[in-house]
Regions:
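C-terminal edge and immediately downstream basic/flexible tail or linker adjoining helix-turn-helix-like DNA-binding
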Residues: 10, 151-154, 168-185
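Sigma70-family region 2
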Residues: 12-13, 40, 53-68, 89
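Structural recognition of an alpha-helix C-terminal capping motif at a helix-to-coil junction
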Residues: 33, 47-54, 69-81
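A short pre-motif secondary-structure segment
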Residues: 135-139
Length: 185
């Protein structure tokens, strides 16, 4: 499979919309969830996602493959900047995505229990400070290394480790308040 870096550099050189579409398909879901951490509204997150890719298409910001960090961290940085500009304009507060759970009658008990735990996890995440929620999302959902998270969030590496530690402690307390004491992280 071709790397994101190669696809974007080819797109920047040749203007082939298929390359940009391939990148959108690869990163759509992750970016939407990331952007939902900034805005409370799925429509706003979708709009910010499209703005991010429009910026890639029209402005063609200079991705430098020789600089440290991956295409993914660069893309998330652009999305983050778009989200922060959006927040400044509209002054929204953040809320995480509430996951749709299928009808209970159609699911086995184990799936229902997992769905309920996930719902409680999202609910607990919504009580965290936005910076804790973002750092935990990038670390555990996007599986990004601390160095990339630092670049995306505009922090140094020690600050990222500190936020992860504080975020995990806050999440544990929130889950305990909800009656979940067996959470592993």
């Amino acid at each position: 499979m071709e790397t994101d870096e190669k696809i974007y550099l080819r797109y920047a050189a040749e203007d082939d919309d298929a390359d940009l579409e391939a990148l959108l398909i690869r990163h759509r879901d992750g970016l939407l969830l990331f952007l939902l951490g900034f805005v409370r509204n799925a429509e706003d997150a979708e709009e910010l996602l499209m703005d991010t890719f429009a910026k890639l298409a029209v402005d063609k910001p200079g991705f430098e493959p020789d600089r440290p960090g991956s295409f993914t961290s660069w893309l998330y940085t652009i999305a983050r900047r778009n989200a922060l500009m959006h927040i400044r304009k509209r002054r929204y507060e953040t809320v995480p995505l509430d996951e749709d759970i299928p009808s209970e009658s159609a699911l086995p008990d184990t799936v229902l229990l997992k769905a309920e735990k996930n719902r409680k996890l999202y609910q607990a995440m919504s009580t965290l400070k936005p910076e804790y929620r973002r750092v935990l999302y990038l670390l555990y959902i996007e599986n990004m290394p601390h160095e990339e998270i630092a670049g995306i969030m505009g922090l140094n590496i020690r600050q990222v480790y500190h936020l992860v530690d504080r975020g995990k402690k806050s999440l544990k307390k929130a889950l305990e308040r909800m009656g979940i004491t067996d959470a592993r992280y």
